[in-house]
Design a protein with these regions (language model features):
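Elongated, acidic membrane-bridging lipid-handling scaffolds
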Residues: 125-232, 296-388, 393-398, 477, ...
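Flexible beta-edge/linker motif
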Residues: 52-118, 132-157, 181-183, 188-190, ...
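Extracellular loop and loop/strand-boundary signature of outer-membrane beta-barrel proteins
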Residues: 73-74, 237-241, 405-407
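Gram-negative outer-membrane beta-barrel proteins
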Residues: 111-113, 155, 229-231, 275-279, ...
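A short, amphipathic edge element
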Residues: 43-51, 415
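N-terminal type II signal-anchor transmembrane helix
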Residues: 1-43, 169, 513, 521-523
Length: 523
């Protein structure tokens, strides 16, 4: 009798298992269609496709295969492709009478291109109103207490045939996503993320999140970057007239991103080995001007903006080179600083955070010892900064293209120095610029043998004037231009005012008007 009871029990369990498995098989396709339909009902501008669904009733789990998310306006390639996503009941929570699940997302691939970004920017429906959270909640009937993403890869393609930007080996772990053990208004979900940036750099993030905050996810975390190669962003930089070659970025900081508060606190960052040039050309002059307006507007919007704090404790640029290429001039020329060292402390967009201090050293045109010290305060009623700078003993032969473009002459030898102090506040500027030319020889028969007769005569006259102006004991040509007045545009950004002051100083004081001196040379 006892043996018959066991046979019946085993048979019942086997039969129930068979029915359950068969039920799972027959339910798979209708359930797949239901999940796909529920997701797409809430989404705007995007479509989700689920290739296959497997329900495992005995394990209280479900698996989704070949999941894709496409942008309706640009469906190829898919923005997201997930080979496998599985969700299973967390048994430990079930013993406490709570139904929660673990979700595992394996090897997801995220592809973003410039065309898709432009479409998103042009769309009338903002990203936060696309319905992502509603879609996820609609197909997640139980609470998700553990989410793991393993071996994810993010690829950004700017324009063919430029090399794509990749963030690989991304692993994410988040817990307590449905506020199971938390109070409202906190960041209930511990969050960790690691990844590899552009093949050799490292990214990490450690903090907390509220995945169901509206209208977007809220995050508060520490994050860091190590040895991220900057050369990979060359395609993006080129659209802004920037040539970027080499350099690495390392840094650490904290972020807080919530519907009511945005904080980006960079505690320390170092850029090493940067090579960067900005190109100005006649063809892009109007675009550059419009871009400058946009930068100015953005600076005004974030300056002392409530709910937004941008802060950098310490930023350094070391062993780098920066240049400016003027292709609008004839001939073209390049101004540059080698051996560049930049140190910024206490940058912020809020007056309450104090004054930013900057120090810059380098070699102007590869030879002129350069030292710049500056203090900047966040803008309220216009730019507010003070700057003191010196460039000493620049080999003037390296400046010949510049001299030809703006003075119609060049030099065979000579040394250039300049000293300046400027103060800008309340729409007014005060200061001086003092250029110094030493041992300058403008005309050289061997160097200038290919030039026409009139150019040779002109350069000979310029050379004669420079000799008349020389302080004989030290063989120096010195002038000083005092600067005082009001800014043409008091609402211009600090950087725009600074660039304009440098341009005016260079072309009105440093190139001191040789033609004027020819008309009335001083002895």
């Amino acid at each position: 009798m006892r043996r018959t009871w066991w046979i019946w029990l085993i048979g019942a369990v086997a039969g129930l298992s068979t029915i359950t498995i068969a039920l799972g098989v027959f339910v798979d396709e209708p359930l797949r269609r239901y999940v796909e339909r529920q997701l797409n009902t809430h989404l705007k501008g995007y479509t989700v496709r689920v290739g296959k669904l497997d329900l495992h009733p005995l394990r209280f789990s479900v698996e989704l295969f070949d999941v894709a998310i496409v942008q309706d306006a640009n469906p190829d390639p898919a923005i997201v492709h997930v080979p496998r996503l599985s969700s299973s009941v967390q048994w430990r929570a079930l013993l406490s009478a709570r139904v929660v699940s673990d979700v595992l997302v394996e090897r997801p691939q995220i592809h973003i291109n410039l065309k898709q970004i432009r479409q998103e920017a042009a769309d009338d429906v903002p990203l936060k109103d696309r319905g992502w959270q509603e879609a996820v909640q609609a197909v997640t009937p139980v609470k998700v207490n553990l989410l793991q993403v393993v071996e994810a890869e993010v690829t950004y393609i700017d324009q063919e045939p430029l090399e794509p930007l990749r963030l690989g080996q991304v692993n994410l772990r988040a817990e307590n996503i449905r506020n199971i053990r938390s109070e409202v208004g906190e960041f209930p979900s511990p969050l960790q993320l690691q990844g590899v940036v552009f093949g050799t750099g490292n990214l990490w993030l450690d903090g907390h999140a509220d995945f169901l905050a509206t209208p977007h996810v809220a995050v508060k975390a520490q994050l860091g970057l190590e040895n991220v190669p900057l050369g990979y962003v060359k395609p993006i930089a080129s659209r802004y007239n920037i040539i970027l070659k080499g350099g690495t970025l390392s840094g650490a900081g904290a972020i807080e991103y919530t519907p009511s508060r945005k904080v980006a606190h960079l505690q320390q960052a170092t850029v090493h080995g940067l090579r960067i040039d900005y190109i100005h050309s006649a063809q892009t002059a109007e675009v550059e001007q419009e871009r400058g307006k946009q930068v100015r507007q953005a600076a005004q919007q974030v300056s002392n903006a409530p709910g937004l704090l941008l802060r950098a404790d310490e930023v350094s640029i070391v062993k780098s080179q920066i240049g400016f290429i003027n292709e609008a001039a004839k001939p073209h020329y390049r101004l540059f600083l080698t051996d560049l060292e930049v140190h910024l402390t206490n940058f912020s967009n809020h007056l309450s955070e104090g004054t930013m201090v900057a120090k810059v050293t380098g070699k102007f045109m590869g030879s002129g010892q350069t030292l710049v010290g500056a203090t900047f305060r966040p803008e309220t009623d216009g730019p507010d900064f003070a700057i003191a700078a010196s460039i000493e003993n620049t080999d003037m032969q390296a400046m010949n293209q510049l001299l030809r473009a703006h003075g119609n002459f060049d030099v065979a030898r000579g040394f250039f120095s300049v000293y300046t102090e400027l103060r800008v506040k309340n729409g007014a500027v005060r200061g001086y610029v003092k250029p110094l030319f030493k041992e300058m020889d403008v005309y050289d028969a061997h160097q200038d043998r290919e030039k026409n007769l009139f150019q040779k005569i002109y350069e000979g006259l310029v050379g004669g004037v420079s000799q008349l102006l020389e302080n004989r004991p030290r063989e120096e040509v010195a002038t000083k231009a005092n600067i005082a007045g009001h800014l043409e545009n008091p609402q211009a950004s600090t950087w725009q005012v600074l660039v304009n002051l440098i341009q005016n100083a260079f072309f009105q004081a440093i190139l001191p008007g040789f033609e004027r001196e020819l008309r009335g040379p001083r002895r």
